[in-house]
Amino acid sequence: MTLASAEKEMAGVLTFFQKETRGFKTGKAHPALVETVTIEVYGTTMRLSDIASISVSDMRQLLISPYDAGTVSAISKGILAANLNLQPIVEGATVRINVPEPTEEYRREVIKQLKRKSEEAKVAIRNIRRTFNDRLKKDDSLTEDAVKSLEKKIQELTDKFCKQIEELAKQKEAELATV
């Protein structure tokens, strides 16, 4: 494992964390709320983002325009089945979703989840660091000074990515608190 590959793995953890937290409902309409919902169409299951365009029509409303108008009812059923606390409204060949304002209890629960997810991401970053350091110590071709230097660099990377995760979590928490 090289320093560059460790950094790439850490960046992957950060990207995964960003994708996970994008789906948290903040009370604002965002395509990420429903794009991964699975829909039963054409005899198979597909993601909503693969069979329709999802746009924000205003701050609290999503507009879903299926590529095939015949899938409107399946989209509506899929959204209801996903248990997202969202009520789809079928209007001809489109589906509208009004995003409800989150309750205080819901916000507290999402903030708990956010903190847990951010801690899991930081643990994953630290595990990458530990794996890298273990491999360094087993590498007989490196001098003690080289090992110390690389350990310092991997620690700097770990600190950088953990800080980015904390900042993202704080932004999301602030977003939840201001709605």
Swiss-Prot record:
User: Where found, per UniProt?
Assistant: Cytoplasm
Q: Which UniProt keywords apply?
A: Cytoplasm, Protein biosynthesis
Q: Which GO biological process entries does UniProt record here?
A: translational termination
- One of its Pfam families is RRF
Q: Which GO terms describe its cellular component?
A: cytoplasm
Which GO MF terms does the UniProt record name?
ribosomal large subunit binding
CDD domains membership: RRF
Q: Is Cytoplasm there in the keyword field?
A: yes
| Major place of residence | cytoplasm
Family according to the record: Belongs to the RRF family.
Its biological purpose is as follows: Responsible for the release of ribosomes from messenger RNA at the termination of protein biosynthesis. May increase the efficiency of translation by recycling ribosomes from one round of translation to another.
- In Swiss-Prot or TrEMBL terms, this protein is called Ribosome-recycling factor
Source organism phylogeny: Bacteria, Pseudomonadati, Chlamydiota, Chlamydiia, Chlamydiales
